[in-house]
């Protein structure tokens, strides 16, 4: 799939390719050149003008609108905050909880989408872990069977960080909306890679430093318009409380949109980079990006499976993503740590992870700018090492 007019253009946009093959976007991504240039341009202007120089707020509004377009939301429903855990904590700490309220969560989720909810137990909130057969294997039927009359909110991730299985977001969200249960989504593992619609979602948080190809601590928080008066900001400052001419008032009146969750100065340099990366991905086409990620993952699986490795998610799973994670199925084969170290020596960067049972995992997460030829290089390197 041709996303670039030439190989030179691909290398210029992603200079990391001139040094190594980076396949760890599900961790912390490398930045495309457009993001670096946007951040440098902002910083260079800051040397000559104040940091809130002319054009900054236009850039912020454009980023808000672009984020809304990615999610199918309104710009008034978007706060520009990162990291992901900040947005999730704003939801957990902003609702008016009552003792006995229930929150359903996935105990084998990434920690950022576990601890904000566990912390609510201090207020008498009851936490119910989904009884999933395997990490990330969540269906609408499984969620519905866990609901009770006391269930207030369900907190899940759009894609599991280890298995790579995506969540059937619309199916679960539609069911929860019909039952009057709030739905909060950690979307960092799909936003920028796979369609992530908030049509049936109430709250969403995602930093840009993975599939959005943006910098760390620049992110997107979505709060459905109808719920903004219910979700009280837990962080207050001069920016999200109405303060005419920066004069403190005798009462607290919040900004009327999702800006009420932005208490102070924004991460403007990060937002500049995030906006540039989002525009780059928008130009490539979200649907085409998804197809490319599935093709890259399928090539890896097909080439590595004959070598005796076991994958956490079958290649024919309809909810597969750009994450491909494998483990050693033979006691005689090399450990994942050794395979990962060999690849690193050969200029290929992956992610060594640990399963919830303590076993070694090797995770591949290429992005749209990678090629099938590069995936074959990975297969060939591992085959030579294991042979």
Model-assigned labels for residue ranges:
Residues 1-387:
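Pyridoxal 5′-phosphate
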């Amino acid at each position: 799939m041709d996303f670039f007019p030439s190989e030179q253009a691909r290398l210029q946009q992603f200079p990391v390719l001139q040094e190594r093959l980076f396949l760890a976007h599900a961790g912390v991504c490398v930045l495309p050149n457009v993001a670096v240039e946007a951040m440098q341009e902002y910083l260079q202007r800051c040397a000559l003008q104040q940091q809130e120089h002319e054009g900054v707020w236009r850039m912020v509004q454009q980023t808000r609108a672009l984020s809304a377009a990615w999610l199918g939301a309104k710009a008034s429903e978007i706060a520009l905050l990162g990291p992901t855990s900040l947005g999730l904590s704003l939801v957990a700490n902003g609702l008016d909880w009552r003792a006995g309220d229930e929150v359903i969560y996935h105990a084998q989720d990434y920690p950022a989408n576990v601890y904000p909810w566990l912390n609510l137990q201090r207020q008498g909130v009851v936490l119910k872990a989904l009884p999933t057969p395997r990490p990330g294997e969540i269906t609408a039927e499984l969620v519905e069977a866990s609901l009770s009359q006391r269930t207030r909110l369900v907190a899940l991730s759009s894609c599991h960080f280890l298995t790579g299985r995506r969540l059937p977001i619309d199916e679960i969200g539609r069911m929860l909306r019909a039952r009057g249960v709030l739905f909060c989504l950690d979307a960092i593992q799909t936003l920028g890679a796979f369609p992530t619609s908030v049509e049936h979602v109430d709250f969403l948080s995602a930093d840009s430093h993975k599939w959005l190809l943006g910098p760390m601590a620049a992110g997107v928080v979505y709060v459905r318009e109808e719920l903004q008066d219910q979700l009280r900001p837990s962080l207050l400052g001069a920016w999200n409380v109405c303060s005419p001419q920066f004069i403190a008032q005798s009462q607290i009146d919040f900004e009327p949109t999702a800006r009420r969750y932005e208490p102070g100065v924004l991460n403007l340099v990060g937002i500049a980079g995030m906006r540039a990366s989002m525009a780059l991905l928008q130009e490539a086409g979200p649907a085409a990006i998804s197809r490319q990620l599935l093709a890259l993952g399928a090539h890896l699986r097909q080439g590595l499976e004959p070598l005796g490795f076991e994958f956490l998610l079958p290649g024919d799973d309809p909810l597969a993503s750009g994450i491909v994670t494998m483990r050693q199925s033979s006691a005689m084969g090399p450990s994942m740590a050794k395979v990962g170290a060999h690849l690193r020596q050969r200029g290929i960067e992956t992610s060594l992870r640990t399963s919830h049972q303590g076993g070694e995992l090797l995770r591949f997460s290429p992005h749209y700018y990678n090629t099938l030829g590069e995936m074959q290089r990975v297969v060939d390197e591992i085959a030579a090492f294991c042979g």
